[in-house]
């Protein structure tokens, strides 16, 4: 015992050197006035206390200050009671050693700096080695005296601090458990109902005075949730370690007769309540020394500052998956519900109308979510069947088909014709998208694009006015003389400059580009064209034919002459079956997604006017109705059809992005509750029960070993017993560490479950259209967001604590193993060294004798 004790004593002397009134002669009475504790704290953390203001006569205040500062600022639990220090002339040596070892472990153990709260300039300290390297002979002698004399003296002077508040029996060091400033046996601090160990911060006063009921137990039996009753993960480990340190320290002060404490009580000792310091995140520090091992439990209660910092710092970004979900919710609230559904692209979101892009048409079909069915319901393809009425001119019919629903025409006519005609339809994108969305009802819903042209065209049957309208889509139409109307001619010329009317193959590309140009160029004209003929002006090619119905058809026929074949099949196919058109349109939509839906809408109006001024106004109303139906669909992101064609055209010119819905109409994402490393509650409690049984067995062994150490028996084996003592304390510390880790895991899983619930509720709220939100909804959103941030912060705090504890514990374990091996090696090396020394000495004597004999003989031989 002299070795470890001497090393610790030498370290204390170095730390207290230069402080007035502090003289370290031993590890017992020299610490009674409390100045030695304050001196060690002040050397490393001068910011924590004012040593010059302390008085050697004020024993109680000095000890109280040192114990409180060490516990609150450094996380070292107070194993000693200031009242005990005042009442005892010679404090318990083992308790002092255990407590001081925590100071050494905290200030000198590598890796502790990161765990403890920030210190302002720590003085470097040289860790004391178990061997008496820095230890002076005086220290060793004093240590030996203390080992025998002081321990036995302590036994005679038992103090109230070593008495259990529940059973009034003596509490040994291994059994000590401090809770709310009272000392208990671990086995005495149990739930009155379920007899399970009380956890720090998770118990309440029982019906009778001095009894307790575990909140967790109540949660199991009652409706409560475990997570709510569970104490913060930080407090438990700390309190448990404090309990261990307190037990070690108080057993020593309590004194000598460890026999007074019942062994059964020790075995029963469950890891009871902590000190009522639930928020300390740090775990006990394992002693760099063997002695420190006993103290590690005390280190458990690391500085509360960590917890405070964690709570103060918002961690919404941290929960990574959860945080991302939260961001998604915010995005949804902004108006992109696609994030909620997990879909990045929504059919309504793209604004292909303003800008005709071949790629846009294709993406729309992918956006066949629930809203697609609604869009399909729209009778956009119905106009297709109407074309038969436009039979007077097959080319005109074809052009009509192309104009009103170029997508339909493309799908219906021969594959080649359909492809070409689609490009001509700038509205095709929307139509194609919607058609793809609703393949089941192609006839009913020709395509969103068709619906838009219908609304713009005023004729009930887009096919009639479509013939001229097709020109913008089939850029060939612009070629038809623009004899009918000057505005139409202007538009036709605009379209014609970029698109060749005669070329059938090129029209697809030119038509798409022209459709975009025409949409932008005719935006202003379209506003003026809402009347029958002017409407056709929005579609330049269509306008020319629009005024003179027959000439227009002729011009369209001539312009489509090269593609006349395509047009005729289209006319035939269109009247045959609208459903066929829808699928074909889908196929064509792939190549022509670029066509702008918005631009297409005005074009159909012009086509309608072209067909006949009277029908065009009529058609416009049905088309508007169709669009209105689309607007009614919550999933439809397209501009409201109710707006007049002029308004739509104005929007087209600016091509503003359609505002996405706040998130309504999208399926809610199912929350993920379980993690990859999820541990069922049953497994956690089962392992904790096993740990408790092992702790009881260790306590029983510790009581017997403590009695031997205090009784002064086997003085020759004190060092060996001390090594065994530290090993036992370390083993207990490992169990307590694992127990606290399980508590962390349990708390983490509860927080994760709660976070999932909060996120789900938040998503349900965000899924509601923003226009329908009430003040209560907005207030609830703020509450949920704040709770989500708090949950994430708490989870981050737990993760940080676990990481820091693991790192520190690994270093402590390595240090402990090295010290134990060194101590055992010294014990084994001593006898071997003696044997070798004796053997070598005798051998040397013999060798010397032989050499002398040889020398004496040699001269004689020579002579």
Swiss-Prot record:
Ranges annotated as biased composition (Low complexity): 143-159, 224-244, 439-450, 482-495, 505-520, 553-566, 638-656
Annotated stretches, region: Necessary and sufficient to associate with tubular recycling endosome membranes, mediate phosphatidic acid-binding and membrane tubulation: 700-863
Placement of sequence motif NPF2: 633-635
Region (Disordered): 119-162, 224-670
Residue span(s) of domain Calponin-homology (CH): 2-108
Domain bMERB: 671-818
The LIM zinc-binding domain, residue ranges: 162-225
Record's keyword terms, sorted: Cell membrane, Cell projection, Coiled coil, Cytoplasm, Cytoskeleton, Endocytosis, Endosome, LIM domain, Membrane, Metal-binding, Phosphoprotein, Protein transport, Transport, Zinc
Keyword DNA repair on entry: no
Coiled-coil ranges per UniProt: 682-711, 785-830
PROSITE patterns assigned: BMERB, CH, LIM_DOMAIN_1, LIM_DOMAIN_2
Chain's role: Lipid-binding protein with higher affinity for phosphatidic acid, a lipid enriched in recycling endosome membranes. On endosome membranes, acts as a downstream effector of Rab proteins recruiting cytosolic proteins to regulate membrane tubulation. Involved in a late step of receptor-mediated endocytosis regulating for instance endocytosed-EGF receptor trafficking. Alternatively, regulates slow endocytic recycling of endocytosed proteins back to the plasma membrane. Also involved in cargo protein delivery to the plasma membrane.
Name assigned to this protein: MICAL-like protein 1
């Amino acid at each position: 015992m002299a070795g470890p004790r001497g090393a610790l004593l030498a370290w204390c002397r170095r730390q207290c050197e230069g402080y007035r009134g502090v003289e370290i002669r031993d590890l017992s009475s020299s610490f009674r006035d409390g100045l030695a504790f304050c001196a060690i704290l002040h050397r490393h953390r001068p910011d924590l206390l004012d040593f010059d203001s302390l008085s050697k006569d004020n024993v109680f205040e000095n000890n109280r200050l040192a114990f409180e500062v060490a516990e609150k600022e450094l996380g070292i639990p107070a194993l000693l009671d200031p009242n005990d220090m005042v009442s005892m002339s010679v404090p318990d040596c083992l308790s002092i050693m255990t407590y001081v070892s925590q100071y050494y472990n905290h200030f000198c153990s590598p890796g502790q700096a990161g765990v403890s709260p920030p210190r302002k300039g720590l003085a470097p300290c040289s860790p004391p080695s178990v061997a008496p390297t820095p230890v002076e002979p005086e220290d060793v002698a004093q240590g030996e005296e203390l080992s025998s004399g002081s321990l036995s003296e302590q036994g005679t002077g038992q103090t109230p601090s070593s008495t259990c508040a529940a059973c009034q029996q003596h509490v040994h060091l291994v059994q000590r458990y401090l809770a709310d400033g009272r000392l208990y046996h671990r086995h005495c601090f149990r739930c009155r109902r379920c007899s399970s160990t009380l956890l720090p911060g998770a118990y309440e006063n029982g019906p009778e005075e001095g009894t307790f009921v575990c909140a967790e137990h109540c949660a199991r039996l009652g409706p409560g949730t475990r997570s709510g009753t569970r104490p913060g993960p930080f407090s438990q480990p700390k309190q448990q370690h404090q309990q261990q340190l307190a037990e070690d320290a108080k057993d020593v002060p309590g004194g000598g007769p460890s026999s007074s404490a019942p062994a059964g009580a020790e075995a029963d000792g469950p890891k009871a309540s902590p000190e009522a310091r639930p928020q300390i995140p740090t775990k006990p520090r394992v002693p760099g020394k063997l002695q420190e091992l006993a103290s590690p439990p005390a280190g458990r209660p690391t500085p509360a500052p960590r917890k405070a910092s964690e709570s103060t710092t918002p961690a919404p970004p941290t929960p990574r998956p959860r945080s991302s979900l939260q961001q998604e919710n915010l995005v949804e609230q902004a108006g992109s519900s696609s994030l909620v559904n997990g879909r990045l692209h929504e059919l309504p979101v793209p604004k292909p109308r303003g800008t005709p892009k071949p790629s846009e048409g294709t993406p729309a079909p992918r956006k066949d979510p629930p809203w697609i069915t609604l869009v399909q319901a729209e009778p956009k393809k119905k106009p297709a069947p109407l074309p038969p009425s436009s039979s007077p001119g097959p080319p005109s019919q074809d052009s009509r088909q192309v104009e009103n629903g170029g997508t339909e025409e493309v799908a219906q006519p021969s594959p080649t014709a359909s492809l070409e005609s689609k490009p001509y339809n700038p509205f095709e994108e929307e139509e194609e998208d919607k058609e793809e969305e609703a393949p089941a009802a192609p006839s009913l819903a020709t395509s969103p694009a068709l619906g838009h042209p219908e609304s713009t065209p005023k004729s009930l049957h887009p096919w009639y006015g479509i013939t001229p309208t097709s020109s913008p889509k089939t850029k060939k139409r612009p070629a038809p003389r623009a004899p009918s109307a000057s505005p139409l001619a202007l538009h036709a010329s605009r379209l014609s400059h970029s698109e060749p009317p005669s070329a059938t193959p090129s029209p697809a590309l030119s038509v798409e580009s022209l459709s975009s140009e025409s949409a932008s160029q005719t935006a202003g004209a379209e506003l003026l064209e809402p009347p029958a003929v002017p409407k056709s002006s929005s579609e330049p090619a269509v306008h020319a034919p629009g005024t003179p119905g027959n000439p227009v058809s002729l011009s369209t026929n001539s312009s489509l002459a090269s593609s006349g074949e395509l047009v005729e099949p289209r006319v035939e196919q269109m009247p045959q079956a609208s459903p066929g058109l829808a699928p074909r349109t889908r196929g064509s939509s792939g190549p022509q997604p670029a066509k702008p839906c918005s631009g297409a809408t005005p074009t159909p109006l012009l086509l309608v006017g072209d067909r006949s001024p009277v029908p065009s106004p009529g058609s416009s109303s049905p088309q508007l109705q169709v669009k209105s139906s689309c607007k009614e669909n919550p999933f439809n992101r397209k501009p409201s059809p109710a707006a007049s064609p002029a308004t739509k055209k104005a929007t087209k010119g600016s091509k503003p992005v359609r505002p996405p819905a706040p998130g309504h109409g999208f399926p809610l994402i199912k929350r993920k509750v379980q993690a990859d490393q999820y541990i069922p509650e049953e497994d956690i409690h089962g392992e904790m029960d096993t740990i408790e049984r092992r702790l009881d067995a260790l306590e029983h062994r510790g009581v017997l070993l403590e009695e031997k150490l205090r009784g002064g028996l086997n003085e020759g084996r004190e060092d060996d017993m001390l090594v065994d003592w530290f090993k036992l304390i370390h083993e207990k510390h490992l169990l307590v560490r694992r127990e606290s880790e399980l508590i962390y895991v349990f708390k983490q899983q509860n927080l994760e479950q709660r976070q999932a619930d909060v996120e789900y509720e938040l998503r349900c709220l965000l899924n509601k259209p923003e226009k329908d939100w009430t003040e209560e909804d907005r207030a609830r959103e703020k509450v949920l967001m704040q709770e989500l941030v708090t949950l994430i912060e708490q989870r981050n705090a737990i993760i940080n604590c676990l990481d820091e504890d693991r790192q520190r514990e690994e270093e402590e374990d390595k240090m402990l193993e090295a010290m134990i091996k060194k101590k055992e090696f010294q014990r084994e090396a001593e006898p071997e060294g003696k044997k070798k020394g004796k053997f070598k000495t005798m051998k040397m004597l013999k060798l010397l004798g032989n050499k002398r004999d040889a020398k004496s003989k040699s001269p004689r031989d020579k002579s």
